[in-house]
Design a protein with these regions (language model features):
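Hydrophobic, aromatic-enriched alpha-helical segments typical of multi-pass transmembrane helices
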Residues: 1-228
Length: 228
């Protein structure tokens, strides 16, 4: 297969679709953040998938940004960098949850409990130092990145505009999470997951359209112009 910008954009669209569906779907099967669950197979599978979601999401938003880099301007760049940093944070956090927490749960359950408290929204007690600021940092870049990138998409008029609005609104809605239990608040991810998948589909469709032979151009192997 020949590697072209069109093919890469299409692949980024598929990556974003997959990442969005994973982000939303994981919320329904995520085990409760308790030490007893950390060594189970369900915990491992969910966090392997979350690492994959982070990698695919990073590839997806990169393709989205490059598709509309001129139209989104500085606002789009800011949103892309913030969301990219969010996905990198997700990858790092999920790696810890998948590969570091299970041994800790057996050998040092009190430390595993403290780490789960950070990721689960429990109040920090200072025992883990700077690590306790991860949840606040992740919230900030998620909120600001989703808002700015979503608005930039809407203004650019290149990809699905209402998907951009859904991304912005879903990201901003996380400000209400302190009002709900963590098990309920995690479903605030659904609008963002849908928006990312929607934008990925929009990117994929637009890539297929622009990648098609233009009207009246010669198609390789046919020897003459073919009207589209």
């Amino acid at each position: 297969m020949t590697i072209t910008p069109s093919n890469l954009s299409g692949a980024a669209g598929v990556a974003a679709i997959t990442a969005g569906l994973l982000y939303g779907g994981i919320q329904f099967v995520h085990p409760v953040e308790e030490v007893a669950n950390v060594t189970g197979s369900a915990w491992a599978i969910v966090h392997y998938l979350t690492v994959a979601m982070g990698v695919l999401g990073l590839a997806g938003i990169t393709g989205m940004y490059l598709k509309q880099v001129q139209e989104t301007g500085l606002l789009g760049l800011s949103g892309f960098l913030l969301l990219g940093l969010f996905y990198l944070t997700v990858i790092a956090n999920s790696f810890v949850e998948a590969f570091v927490l299970p041994p800790l749960a057996e050998q040092a359950p009190h430390i595993a409990t403290d780490i789960l408290g950070i990721f689960g929204g429990a109040a920090a007690d200072g025992s883990l130092g700077p690590l306790e600021g991860i949840s606040t940092f992740a919230f900030a870049i998620y909120f600001l990145g989703g808002l700015t990138f979503g608005v930039a998409v809407f203004r650019a008029r290149v990809l699905a505009r209402w998907a951009g609005i859904l991304l912005a609104a879903g990201s901003v809605s996380t400000a209400l999470l302190p009002l709900f239990p963590h098990a309920v608040g995690r479903f605030a991810a659904l609008p963002v997951g849908i928006a990312v998948a929607w934008l990925g589909y929009s990117l994929w469709v637009s890539t297929r359209k622009t990648g098609s032979p233009a009207a009246g151009t010669a198609v390789p192997g046919r020897g003459r112009a073919v009207a589209q």
